[in-house]
Regions:
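Middle-to-C-terminal accessory/interaction subdomains
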Residues: 1-165
Length: 166
């Protein structure tokens, strides 16, 4: 969940040559993973990204137009829902995300004292480094169920089924 999106922190571009494809990039994700009150595990970013009349920040109508129009296409809508389901059950499965967080935190933990000394305002929540990592860990645990609920509500899905391939 990024509470500072989709009206900011994204860029769209393409080369000005025949046949070039549009590119999309999101950046500046410090409002994600529970790092800000607008980026909590319960934040309904699907509603933000599809609102027709959002406020100037974070989701003015121009910033949601592309996804709204794409979702008007039944094939795209189905693929969007299917990809979400695949990713929420694999890429964003809590144990997988926790392993990534723990690995990354372990890789940089020894640098945190030097970082705090050099940039004392960069970790400004008043929490310890480990408390900030724990906020991310809790987000990783709580987010999938919330995001599923947002998809179920938006698209009128009554539930899910499990498929095991041996």
């Amino acid at each position: 969940a990024n509470g500072d999106w989709p009206g900011s922190n994204m860029k769209l571009w393409r080369e000005r040559v025949a046949g070039s494809k549009w590119r999309w990039m999101i950046y500046d994700l410090d409002f994600t993973f529970g790092g800000n009150a607008q980026g909590l595990a319960t934040t309904n970013t699907l509603a933000q990204a599809t609102a027709t009349n959002g406020p100037d920040w974070p989701n003015p109508p121009w910033s949601t137009l592309m996804l709204r129009k794409l979702l008007d296409n039944p094939d795209f809508k189905n693929e969007f829902i299917q990809r979400f389901a695949a990713h929420v059950n694999t890429t964003f499965e809590p144990n997988h995300v926790l392993a990534v967080i723990d690995s990354m935190a372990g890789n940089i933990a020894s640098e945190i004292p030097r970082h705090k000394e050099r940039w004392p305002q960069s970790i400004s929540f008043g929490n310890s480094w480990q408390e900030l990592v724990d906020i991310m860990r809790n987000f990783a645990i709580d987010r999938p169920a919330n995001a599923r609920g947002h998809f179920y509500s938006k698209f009128g899905i009554s539930g899910s089924s499990s498929l095991v391939i041996s």
